[in-house]
Amino acid sequence: MGISANLFVNQKGTTTALKQPKEIGYYSRNQTEEYLVSDDINLRYYYLPDQEIEHGIDLSAGASKFRDVAKDFKDRCSLKGLLDTLMEYEKKKNKKSNVDIITFRGIMSKLIRASMEPPNFNKVDLRIVSYDGQLFIKDVSDYNAATNESNSSGVNSRQQAGTSRQQIDTYTGYKFEGIATLDKPLPYVEREVIEKRPRKILNNGDEYITVVRTGVGECKVVLGAEIDCIFDFKEEGKDNLKHYTELKCSSQISTTNDVRRFEKKMFRAWLQCFLVGVPRVIYGFRDDQYMLKTVEEFSTEEIPVIIKANNPTLGQSCLDAIKWYGLFTDWLLKIIPREQSGNIRAYRLVYENNHLRLSEIEEQDGEYSRYVLEDGILTPEFKEWRESLRVPSEETPKAD
């Protein structure tokens, strides 16, 4: 019988030791589902002068023309770009990276938030494969259940019922990114391009993803994370985490309830940025008519202080999140065997009621072939690369 285990989310961890995030690579994904390693073609640059806001920016403009290309992707949660980037990094060093877990920031964020959000609000439906001494984790949630972490819930402009208010609320996030960024540094952009930003048709297919090595406690992690833009400039050939920025859009704050809702949004934004070392969040605030009214910048490291000053209970959640991060990663590493071999074992990890439930996918299971024998998570190229590192030699290189 396969492995099965539960982790109750009310447990409290003690680990607060964190590893400094370090960028080890990046890639771009385009509208045709291509993954371009070490290509920053989809990296954006922040530029939104005050006078543009004063002239009035309608964040709902163009919602009916939004191109929801991600819904047609063959595998929109694919690890291919992440694995290809990790493989390129390892080839430069000619050795396997010394890490325990490889996944996306959004998945790690979901798992952390499971300790403070119910499963109907935070759907966790993951598949894990244990291979070559490491765990590779993929989100297999339905498209409509995607969280706002990845900005991939989409706005389907093709629905016959038209564009709902909820869809427009989602769209304003894309719109804010569209009007606040450029595809090149400002000196290389023509004035005409800047002026046409409000009329640009947007899509959810183009992304720029950083690949970061980080960790908590004894667990070493590689995370892929979508980056909204560069705040100032990019340093070629260097770690650019300090230059990256998260962009968010929210309704204006008028009531006490608005304050509480925004504090929860800030916590999630902090968690996103904290996990991969993004140092700032820029919020655009809209009124009830979706007009952009103000823009405010927050330092990631100051957000817990801001939250705690207004809401001590929620402020404690930042520290609790780190402790839970350490607890559940340690649990995964202890429960799931990690053989230093080419053997693959697959598992389900779901969030039910008050616990995370892990169960092994056995040979008679309908998903076994996809995740163990085929490329449901691991690509043939990545497995071939790792197999090449196991070819006997006079001296086996140490892991990075």
Swiss-Prot record:
Residue stretches spanning the membrane: none
Q: What is its main location?
A: nucleus
One GO molecular function term of this record is: metal ion binding
UniProt catalytic activity: a 5'-end NAD(+)-phospho-ribonucleoside in mRNA + H2O = a 5'-end phospho-ribonucleoside in mRNA + NAD(+) + H(+); a 5'-end (N(7)-methyl 5'-triphosphoguanosine)-ribonucleoside-ribonucleotide in mRNA + H2O = a (N(7)-methyl 5'-triphosphoguanosine)-nucleoside + a 5'-end phospho-ribonucleoside in mRNA + H(+); a 5'-end triphospho-ribonucleoside in mRNA + H2O = a 5'-end phospho-ribonucleoside in mRNA + diphosphate + H(+)
Q: What class of enzyme is it?
A: hydrolase
For this UniProt record, the keywords arranged alphabetically read as follows: Hydrolase, Metal-binding, mRNA processing, Nuclease, Nucleotide-binding, Nucleus, RNA-binding
Binding locations of a divalent metal cation: 177, 228, 246-247
Q: Where does substrate bind?
A: 226, 248, 272
State the InterPro entries in the record: RAI1 (IPR013961), RAI1-like_fam (IPR039039)
**Keyword Transmembrane helix tagged:** no
One cellular component term (GO) for this entry is: RNA polymerase II termination complex
The cofactor binding remark recorded in the entry reads: Divalent metal cation.
> Under which EC number(s) is this enzyme classified?
3.6.1.-
The parts of the chain that form a coiled coil are: none
Subcellular location field: Nucleus
Q: Which GO terms describe its biological process?
A: cleavage in ITS2 between 5.8S rRNA and LSU-rRNA of tricistronic rRNA transcript (SSU-rRNA, 5.8S rRNA, LSU-rRNA); deadenylation-independent decapping of nuclear-transcribed mRNA; mRNA processing; NAD-cap decapping; nuclear polyadenylation-dependent rRNA catabolic process; positive regulation of termination of RNA polymerase II transcription; termination of RNA polymerase II transcription, poly(A)-coupled
Q: What cofactors does the UniProt entry give for this protein? A: a divalent metal cation
Show the PANTHER family listed in the entry.
Answer: DECAPPING AND EXORIBONUCLEASE PROTEIN, DOM-3 RELATED
Assembly, in brief, is: Interacts with RAT1; the interaction is direct, stabilizes RAT1 protein structure and stimulates its exoribonuclease activity. The interaction also stimulates RAI1 pyrophosphohydrolase activity, probably by recruiting it to mRNA substrates.
What protein family is recorded? Belongs to the DXO/Dom3Z family.
Physiological role: Decapping enzyme for NAD-capped RNAs: specifically hydrolyzes the nicotinamide adenine dinucleotide (NAD) cap from a subset of RNAs by removing the entire NAD moiety from the 5'-end of an NAD-capped RNA. The NAD-cap is present at the 5'-end of some RNAs and snoRNAs. In contrast to the canonical 5'-end N7 methylguanosine (m7G) cap, the NAD cap promotes mRNA decay. Also acts as a non-canonical decapping enzyme that removes the entire cap structure of m7G capped or incompletely capped RNAs.
Query: Which named protein is this?
Result: Decapping nuclease RAI1
Q: What is the lineage of its organism?
A: Eukaryota, Fungi, Dikarya, Ascomycota, Saccharomycotina
Give the gene that encodes this protein. RAI1
